[in-house]
């Protein structure tokens, strides 16, 4: 056991880092904050950690949604050959050289100009040679080389990554992938259906298109809520809006065709739907299904 958690909480990210490496925190409103690893209070294996809001100068109306561990912000070769790629819920993507984030400021900086009615969704570290994949609620996904996104300054708002079908459609996830890296594509719908498909099923296209079908969205499946890059060494933590939580191994899911409906991952109570999906390191423990009070079902 690496840490204790509060009720309804679980460990989602685990980083191996030295004291002098940096953690970059990206917020919903498009700001970036820094912390040296040694500035994070050290705890025991049993401690529950500290709330991020107590460690960085985060406004009350903003929240952290992406974390990036950076090896060395003083290595010119490293910072000039890596990028931060961000996407918003409305399908805007932006790439900025890591060098632009190499001068930490206590109060953070603007990482992307967010347009009205939009919010930041994801931020990833890339090496300039990877592919970007996004999926939207209507069940479409697009894959394109990151070279199709030119590097921009921090004040820029970005360019179109995917064209959504209607104004209520939005991006649900972004992954950074490359052929041969061993990852499969995992999508989950709001009614608890999921599907693991091969990355090879998604042809590389140009940025800005409508994408291809990644899951057949029906009244039974509900709209798409999650996109993850997974391997057999991952677990999925599935959380519903009424408080049910289930953990399941990706290795229990077979690879299926891109346009299929998928399989039911969880039986939902009437009126319940999936709230969020997290990819976590595989557990050797048996999976447990918990109700809203935290009792094993």
How does the language model describe each region?
Residues 1-297:
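Short, structured "edge-of-domain" segments at secondary-structure transitions
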